[in-house]
Amino acid sequence: MGKDTIANIITSIRNADMNRKGMVRIPATNITENIVKILLREGFIENVRKHRESNKDFWVLTLRHRRNRKGPYKTILNLKRISRPGLRIYSNYQKIPRILGGMGIVILSTSRGIMTDREARLQGIGGEILCYIW
């Protein structure tokens, strides 16, 4: 049984968001770096910094929480892993699903790297659907 790093980071972010934690630490790999850049660019996280501890690199993510009178509430409503090691899901650019009518994002792994559904549609390429965020 292998490790599924994408499921691990999605679960870490979801758990920290549900418990209203301000920060979450995830292992730094090339895949997680690309996903973190997308989350930062799309506004789901506030800040990212790289942390080195005992010869291992980690990303420390600052989650974005909005404040109201009762306290902070979460911004990321849901993260869902779609393609997994036991069942890969692929889509061409015409059949990439739209999440909440375009309000959410789909993260894809394409031949040109990891990107969002909007970027893949603009470039006219499909790929493996990694996760939904809405």
Curated annotation (Swiss-Prot):
GO biological process: translation
Principal location: plastid
InterPro entries listed in its UniProt record: Ribosomal_uS8, Ribosomal_uS8_CS, Ribosomal_uS8_sf
Entries under SUPFAM superfamilies matching the protein: Ribosomal protein S8
Keywords of the record: Chloroplast, Plastid, Ribonucleoprotein, Ribosomal protein, RNA-binding, rRNA-binding
Keyword match Ribosomal protein: yes
Subcellular location: Plastid, Chloroplast
Top-rank taxon: Eukaryota
GO-annotated cellular components: chloroplast; ribonucleoprotein complex; ribosome
Gene Ontology molecular function: rRNA binding; structural constituent of ribosome
PANTHER family listed in its UniProt record: 40S RIBOSOMAL PROTEIN S15A
Subunit and interaction comment: Part of the 30S ribosomal subunit.
Family: Belongs to the universal ribosomal protein uS8 family.
Chain's role: One of the primary rRNA binding proteins, it binds directly to 16S rRNA central domain where it helps coordinate assembly of the platform of the 30S subunit.
HAMAP family: Ribosomal_uS8_B
Protein name (record): Small ribosomal subunit protein uS8c
Gene: rps8
